[in-house]
Regions:
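Active-site pre-lysine segment of PLP-dependent enzymes
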Residues: 164-172, 188-211, 215-245
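PLP-dependent aminotransferase-like
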Residues: 122-180
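N-terminal "arm"/small-domain region of PLP-dependent enzymes with the aminotransferase-like
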Residues: 24-82, 173
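Short N-terminal helix/helix-N-cap motif within the alpha/beta-hydrolase-1
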Residues: 111, 117, 135, 221-223
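Hydrophobic/aromatic beta-strand patches that form the interior of the parallel beta-sheet core
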Residues: 54-56, 131, 152, 212, ...
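Phosphate-binding glycine-rich loop
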Residues: 90-129
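N-terminal secretory signal peptides and thylakoid transit peptides that target proteins
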Residues: 1-16
Length: 245
């Protein structure tokens, strides 16, 4: 996003910035409650200790962390009594350098999920909906409903691709569009030119609507037409790109 971290927090407003904490904290309990109430989750817990278990629905690495990662974790234990202020700055600087952006354009979260929830709180209201296709990664829509924000869910097309025209039509008056590219769980991809045209169409239809482009699966894309939307976000204050690692 071309605005700074300070501008993003300011967009929450003085009142909302104070109110954001309670819904975000309560949501963690809500997630646990949902998991307990779902039979497949209960079965998942029973099977979690089975030897050689591979849970492809969770995109987990069955081999676990690599040796270098384990060593880095072990080395860090000696500093666990300290607040990671310098480490946070170092991480921000490393991400900014790798992506070719200013450090002030990078925001860290506890997984991208925290940033998705913060975006819902920042950009949606009781009369400015979240637009999230169906199906897509469900966390933003689930959280929006939890905090009683309206959700509009345009269905994917016959090829399981996000229906860009339907999303543009639904964007009028919306606060936030959640655009997962590649899309989870349909594994469909929109090329760079398509995404650029889509952003322009939304800007024309609803100039104040923010578009959050989730690139969680960026590293796995083989489609040559695909491009990251980071350059679009750097040029457009109404576009945010999230990644996870």
């Amino acid at each position: 996003m071309s605005v700074s971290r300070r501008s993003f927090v300011a967009s929450l407003g003085a009142g909302t910035a104070g109110l954001i904490t309670a819904p975000l904290i309560r949501w963690h309990g809500h997630e646990a409650l949902l998991a307990q109430g779902q039979p497949e989750r209960r079965a998942d817990r029973l099977l979690a200790s089975a030897p050689g278990m591979i849970r492809v629905d969770s995109n987990e690495n069955p081999n676990g962390p690599g040796q270098r990662a384990l060593q880095a974790i072990s080395n860090a234990f000696g500093h666990a009594n300290r607040y990671p202020v310098k480490e946070e700055d170092d991480t921000l600087a490393a991400i900014a350098k790798a992506r070719g952006v200013a450090q002030s354009n990078v925001i860290l979260g506890c997984g991208s999920g925290e940033l998705l929830r913060a975006a819902v709180m920042a950009f949606t209201t009781s009369d400015r909906a979240l637009v999230a296709p169906e199906p897509t990664f469900e966390a933003p829509a689930n959280f929006a409903r939890f905090v009683q924000r309206p959700v509009v869910a345009p269905p994917v097309d016959a090829k399981l691709r996000l229906d860009l025209d339907a999303i543009v039509a639904a964007s009028r008056g919306a606060g936030l569009i959640y655009f997962c590219n590649p899309n989870n769980p349909t594994a469909t991809v929109h090329g760079g030119d398509e995404v650029a045209s889509f952003v322009e169409a939304v800007n024309r239809a609803s100039p104040e609507t923010v578009i959050l482009i989730d690139e969680a699966y960026h590293e796995y894309v083989a489609d040559k037409s695909y491009r990251t939307a980071i350059p679009i976000a750097m040029a457009n204050p109404h576009v945010v790109v999230t990644r996870t690692f």
